[in-house]
């Protein structure tokens, strides 16, 4: 940003390029700080926004000074300020058909996400609709093709913006992957939900499912979109649905159902599709479940669970459990392949209000800046099996 301010434009084209660079930079800084505040700060609660989050550093040069931790409110204010700057610089200043360059559509979608986290339902709905007014297409899985084609790619008509791809999706999509889809996630999909086919794949000779959303099983190529920083039209439809559902009232709930069903019509087998008839908290919960099914493996779930715990509408008061297992691997000369057995498993529980919903600031940062650590307590498993 500082360098862009020092550039002089010789003509209108160069000035538009300079403004575009500034707009993209403001968008990216907003996205980075939005990510940081949701990792290391408490979830945004309108009644309690003075809690510590992360330091704000807005200069590009090294400064010899001590930084202080800014509050959740201050970081969110900075995120929105950067998005307003991005809006001003990118509106009407487009680079068409470039998935790795943020434009005004991406700005609107990120704004809708930020306002959704802030529980500002009206602004969330407004900016989701602004995004959809520019790009609303959804892939119809009923006619998508065969199971050999990956769903999330740089050429998808749903893609609004993505950072570059990496090899993580490929590394987590073979029989030796260190992670797999949870049984709870798999059970979220009905047999008529086509996402089960295009988002997940069963690992041969096991009871596990891997993600095949970005690359197919045993693929040798890396994903060409990010598994954490990807913006799709599907999210805009879900943001719109959730915002209207949380506003409440007959008309708003009908808008929510319409937005939700627009997505579901493209995901459920046509012969088994039924329109949504829910209302009230049941509608909100169904939209949240749909969000989990649709946005799995895109970096949304942890942040969503955090914000549900402080939501004024249908707050999440339960707990989540995860089981971590250790495996013994062995080679079978006769079958010429590896097999494995679970040697031990430990189950941990995270309840609503637990400080572990906020990650600990890395040790190196705490030492360098002499910052106060986020509160934690020693955690023991609730059960262990050997």
PLM feature spans:
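Conserved, well-structured interaction surfaces
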Residues: 1-40, 70, 87-92, 221-228, ...
